[in-house]
UniProtKB/Swiss-Prot annotation:
Source organism per UniProt: Klebsiella pneumoniae (strain 342)
Pfam families, per the entry: AnmK (PF03702)
Protein name: Anhydro-N-acetylmuramic acid kinase
NCBIfam families membership: PRK09585.1-1, PRK09585.1-3, PRK09585.3-2
Record key words, sorted: ATP-binding, Carbohydrate metabolism, Kinase, Nucleotide-binding, Transferase
Family, similarity comment: Belongs to the anhydro-N-acetylmuramic acid kinase family.
């Protein structure tokens, strides 16, 4: 079983940057050693958003974006390697999630698409890449998501305490860690995605820092109930979703039924939508003693306060307090999944994704031997 240094690369639905993490991994530990966030150029971000909202494009446009993202991921990895004085031979593999542009786990031909050519990453970094993690799970009848609960269980499960790990990225998802029971995990709905989309359209800001704008508003109950009536929220777990569903067009559809709404009130209502849909799923799952929050939403004081209020009797804290960086959690998870793939170990949890069996995930893109590199 190979152990050593792995790099994880994550570009999530929030599109707030590319997270790159270096970790030492073996069967007993995952020790984070360094990290950085690499910016996504605005034109690329706009192209990704357009695809996720169903805008048509040619195969040539998709191919070019796939290549450009692959180079961008490679640049992000190379920046971390320069920062840490690493040679390609110092790193066993890179685990790259890719950028999800479509995720449709229902229907007669379930599918998911992550772009960012892994061949580009392997060629330009000189390091073996493991990518395309989700489709093997879908081939076995699973949702292809979420995959991070397996990592949560490995690092954050407690022998006697009933815990849940909540990741509030663009989409929010939970992992239920109950001693003696199979791990469960699923998406709860929008996390930061609609909050970020609204403030971007209204103020040109990428996110609502410290929930300052939302805190100036009041919750619009009719709008909140209207959004909560979306049938997706009533679907049974396990379930998954993404920007192809909960996007700005979804929000516009609901806002079109009202007039004269103040921007800060809409922002406050979107924050409440995130908090309510998360807390409802926590309670439906039987609740927990401790809710460990990671992702960008863990730095949103309004969301954290509302979760604590909606979940009395539950200790709401961050994964940082448990020793794992909440900002780097998902990138760490894909470094760990790359290690499992190379070790021939399953990376999915059928109790989470609904797959018929546990399986090794991903495809391997080997680096050229050092003597073959120019």
């Amino acid at each position: 079983m190979r152990s050593g240094r792995f790099i994880g690369v994550m570009s999530g639905t929030s599109l707030d940057g590319i997270d790159v993490v270096l970790a030492a991994i073996n069967e007993n530990i995952v020790a984070q050693q360094a990290s950085l966030t690499w910016p996504i150029p605005h034109p690329i971000k706009e192209e990704i958003l357009a695809i996720c909202q169903g805008q048509s494009l040619t195969l040539s446009q998709l191919g070019r974006l796939d290549t450009r993202l692959g180079r961008l991921f490679a640049d992000a990895v190379l920046a971390l390697m320069r920062q840490e004085n690493l040679k390609p031979t110092d790193v066993i593999a890179i685990g790259c999630h890719g950028q999800t542009v479509w995720h449709e786990p229902q229907g007669d031909a379930p599918h998911t698409l992550q772009i960012g050519d892994n061949n580009q990453i392997a060629a330009h970094t000189g390091v073996t890449v493991v990518g395309d993690f989700r489709r093997r799970d879908m081939a076995l009848g699973g949702q292809g998501a979420p995959l991070v609960p397996a990592f949560h269980h490995a690092l954050l499960a407690h022998p006697i305490e009933r815990r849940m790990v909540l990741n509030i990225g663009g989409i929010a998802n939970v992992s239920l860690l109950v001693p003696g029971q199979p791990v469960r995990g699923y998406d709860t709905g929008p996390g930061n995605m609609l909050l970020d989309a609204w403030i971007w359209r209204q103020q040109g800001k990428p996110y609502d820092k410290d929930a300052q704008w939302a805190s100036e508003g009041k919750v619009l109950l009719p709008l909140l109930q209207d959004m909560l009536s979306d049938p997706w929220f009533a679907l049974p777990a396990p379930k998954s979703t993404g920007r192809e569903y909960f996007n700005y067009g979804w929000l516009e559809k609901h806002l079109a039924r009202y007039s004269g709404l103040r921007g800060q009130d809409v922002q406050a209502t979107l924050a409440e939508l995130t908090a309510v849909t998360i807390s409802e799923q926590v309670l439906l799952s039987g609740g927990c003693e401790r809710l460990l929050v990671c992702g960008g939403g863990a730095r949103n004081p309004l969301l954290m306060a509302r979760l604590a209020a909606l979940l009395p009797g539950t200790e709401v804290s961050t994964t940082d307090e448990a020793g794992i960086s909440g900002d780097d959690m998902e990138a760490l998870a894909f470094a760990w999944l790359a290690w499992r793939t190379l070790a021939g170990l399953p990376g999915n949890l059928p109790s989470v994704t609904g797959a018929s069996e546990a399986t090794v995930l991903g495809a391997i893109f080997p680096a050229n031997p050092p003597q073959n590199r120019s």
